[in-house]
A protein has these predicted regions:
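Short, active-site-adjacent cap segments at secondary-structure transitions
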Residues: 17-19, 58-62, 116-119
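Conserved active-site and cofactor/substrate-binding residues in soluble primary-metabolism enzymes
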Residues: 23-34, 55, 63, 88, ...
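General beta-strand structural signal in soluble alpha/beta enzymes
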Residues: 11, 52-55, 108-113
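Ligand-binding beta-strand-loop-alpha-helix segment within the catalytic cores
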Residues: 66-139
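N-terminal glycine-/serine-/threonine-rich phosphate-binding loop
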Residues: 1-52
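Non-transmembrane, interaction-prone segments in cytosolic or luminal domains
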Residues: 12-13, 24-31, 43-45, 59-60, ...
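Long, low-complexity, intrinsically disordered polar/charged segments
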Residues: 34-84, 104-106
Length: 139
């Protein structure tokens, strides 16, 4: 697999599509499940595809991030506590997506961006993609 693999698709399930942004931590499970079923069906039609699925945080991470102001960066112990709260909230949505993927018989592995990206001034400086590339290379 190269960086320009024509069989690799990235599909982002937008946070405003899969959550109710007006209500904190409110997932639209029926929509998520339907989208994941569509993805599985596409993979069945074309087994050569490699699909990377991402999703936004919607009413999960964004509400918590606003509460703790983590967009301004983290440096103090209080900031890191806020960062942890945002991570926990975003992880809840990710667990819902992963659970629904399993229910749709779509095997997925989660790669949280917070574990692999390094930023400065809101710009990604480095993104460790080796684990993701290894999974994609092996099916």
């Amino acid at each position: 697999m190269t960086d320009l693999d024509p069989n690799l698709l990235f599909i982002k399930l937008g946070g405003s599509l899969i959550t109710d942004k007006d209500q904190a931590e409110s997932a639209k499970a029926d929509i998520i499940f339907a989208l994941l079923q569509e993805i599985r069906q596409q993979l069945q039609r074309d087994p050569s595809l490699k699909i990377l699925i991402g999703h936004g945080s919607g009413s999960f991470g964004h509400h918590t991030a606003r509460k703790f102001g983590t967009r301004q960066g983290v440096s103090t112990p209080e900031d890191w506590q806020g960062f942890q709260e945002v991570w926990l909230s975003a992880r809840k949505l990710n667990q819902i997506v992963v659970y629904l993927a399993a229910k749709a018989r779509l095997p997925v592995i989660s790669f949280p961006p917070s574990a692999a990206t390094f930023t400065a001034n809101h710009i990604v400086q480095r993104w460790e993609l080796t684990p993701m590339r290894n999974v994609l290379a092996h099916g």
